[in-house]
Amino acid sequence: QAYVAGSHPGVIVGMNVSFAGLLDASEAAQITALFSSSDDVFVSYYLGDNGFGQVSSTTVPADLDTMIAFAGSRPLILKELGYATGTTGHTEAGQVAFITDLFQAWDAHASRIPMVTISRMFDGDPTECASEAQSYGAAGNQDFIAFLCTLGVRTYADAPKPAWATLASAAARRGF
């Protein structure tokens, strides 16, 4: 951080951690040390089961509180987030609830979270999702492929999923 600040004043230094990684007690000391010299904290966040069979989160407000606590006085950037509708136990209604809860929780912490990036606008092409899963070392993992392919708020064919209207309305109410 000192080098960057000296060489390129005004450049923000940060790194990304997944929310699941943030919760990993065995890595807590290393993650805290890595972030000790960052200006901002970047987190990737996917509610519930990420396709690998592990549930890393349960409720958006509680999870956001955990992220804010970790960030301390630094801004929290939600670098990528989403809710896949195709993984085991996930639904389109769940994606609507996720978007609703996200905006409500963001409103509660608006001064601390300057940016939120929803991971994917559109669901993926199944062939491309299978290839992407392979790059993660998860070739043939159908739940993970479904996770990658159903993160969008619009289908691959560009039809709106129920969460699209929720997202558009919530964004419009906030001037986006």
What label would you give each PLM region?
Residues T88-G94, A108-I113, T117-F176:
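Aromatic-rich peripheral "rim/lid" segments of glycoside hydrolase catalytic domains that contact
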Residues A2-V11, S37, T66-L76, A105-I113, ...:
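A structural motif corresponding to the C-terminal end of an alpha-helix
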Residues Q1-E27, S73-G86, I113-D123:
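Aromatic-lined carbohydrate-recognition surfaces of secreted/lumenal glycan-active proteins
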Residues Y3, Y45-Y46, Y83, Y136, ...:
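Sequence-level detector for tyrosine residue identity
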Residues Q1, Q30-L34, T59-M67, G94-A105, ...:
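A general structural detector for well-ordered alpha-helical segments in enzyme core domains, enriched
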Residues D24-T88, D107-A108, R112:
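Glycoside hydrolase catalytic-domain groove-lining segments
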Residues S18, S26, Y46-D49, V60-D63, ...:
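Long hydrophobic alpha-helices with heptad-repeat/coiled-coil character
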Residues H8-F19, S44-T59, R112-D123, A159, ...:
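Hydrophobic transmembrane alpha-helix bundles
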